[in-house]
Amino acid sequence: MKSDIHPDYHFIKVVMTDGTEYTTRSTFGKEGDTLALDIDPRTHPAWTGGTQQLLDRGGRVSRFKNKFGALLKG
């Protein structure tokens, strides 16, 4: 196996949407960084039964509806 080709694998702190924190190993950032989640298993529609509204991050949902809205109504 080649040396120095793999990313650094270190501990980071992950903060869930409800403020719960846990430590895990990741290649994200650097040792001790914090990753704050916008959506997690407790709030994602796939795991909550789809009762929450989809967040329109950066207008992506709006652009999709504008582009493909006619197909969705069909």
Swiss-Prot record:
Family annotation (PROSITE patterns): RIBOSOMAL_L31
Annotated GO molecular function terms are: rRNA binding; structural constituent of ribosome
Q: What GO biological process, any one, is recorded here?
A: translation
- Look up the domain of life of the source: Bacteria
Q: Does Ribosomal protein count among this protein's keywords?
A: yes
TM helices/strands, residue ranges: none
Keywords in alphabetical order, please: Ribonucleoprotein, Ribosomal protein, RNA-binding, rRNA-binding
In Pfam terms, one family for this protein is: Ribosomal_L31
Which is a Gene Ontology cellular component entry for this protein?
ribosome
According to the UniProt entry, where is the signal peptide?
none
Q: Which family does it belong to?
A: Belongs to the bacterial ribosomal protein bL31 family. Type A subfamily.
Function recorded in the entry = Binds the 23S rRNA.
On subunit structure and binding partners, the annotation says: Part of the 50S ribosomal subunit.
What NCBIfam families does this protein map onto?
A: L31, PRK00528.1
Q: Which PANTHER family match?
A: 50S RIBOSOMAL PROTEIN L31, CHLOROPLASTIC (PTHR33280), LARGE RIBOSOMAL SUBUNIT PROTEIN BL31A (PTHR33280:SF6)
Name of the molecule in the record: Large ribosomal subunit protein bL31
Q: Which organism is it from?
A: Azorhizobium caulinodans (strain ATCC 43989 / DSM 5975 / JCM 20966 / LMG 6465 / NBRC 14845 / NCIMB 13405 / ORS 571)
Lineage, top ranks: Bacteria, Pseudomonadati, Pseudomonadota, Alphaproteobacteria, Hyphomicrobiales
